[in-house]
Amino acid sequence: SMTAAKLQHIPQLVRQQYVAAIEAGDAFFFESDVRIVRGQNVQRPVPWQIRIVPALLKKPKAPVSAEEEVRPKQNQVDVFAPPYVPNLLVKELDDFTVLLNKYCVLPHHYLLVTRDFVSQEKPPSPSMLALVYSMITSHTPSSDGAELLGFFNCGPNSGASQPHCHFQLVELTPSENATKAVPIEHMLDTQSAPDEDKEEILGLAVPWRHFVARLEPPSDPEKLENYFGKRFSHLLEAMFSLALEKNDENKGL
């Protein structure tokens, strides 16, 4: 298993590589605005944060110069497979690689990708979940209180633009007028009592199916993989059982 000491250096490496990649033109940052939107006619509305990125409407294409022609290029068949662009490569781990995201809406946006090709339409493996959890818990919040958020878009319908398995990690700070960096935490605070059964899967009161598993992982890193495999399977069971109950052709999504 990956030691916490090795993982603690990743945010620092990400920052160094990010500066180098932006300066070299191997990564791109797009300015954005955040709007806070609160639900109408609901108790305790969640302050949803909607990020608007006008530049993504039309990504500019610069004319190809002689310098561009010799620039290291991503693998055209699979951008998350070797050979990696040196400025986008943060760290190679055993079965995974840490890469910078080429197109950033938030600074220091990076990815954990499988070394070998695995489809993004498959759920993340227990080993990947355990590693992401370890990366998040070994992350030291910066002076502005930024927290590390990991998210996984499972296939094109949920926003994944690449077919190679990847988990995304970003640093988030609470937006103006918001007390939490992750809006859904407001619902967790109001929907779960401290003494509730920690094994229970929570279904959140939103207009889509959203299930939450609270975590109390074992302190032994060797047992993390098994723990996350079980908790994730409980989430999937909750999703599919509700889909069956509703006779849902979309499998609960």
State each model region's role:
Residues 1-124, 174, 178-229, 233-253:
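Active-site microenvironments that recognize anionic phosphate/pyrophosphate groups
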Residues 42-44, 144, 161:
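Solvent-exposed loop and beta-edge segments used for protein-protein assembly and interaction
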Residues 78-80, 136-143, 171, 191:
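Short, well-ordered alpha-helical segments in soluble proteins
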Residues 94-96, 108-109, 146-150, 161-167:
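Generic beta-strand structural signal
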Residues 108-149:
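Short N-terminal edge-element motif at the start of the domain
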Residues 151-179:
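Histidine-centered divalent-metal-coordination microenvironment in nucleic-acid enzymes
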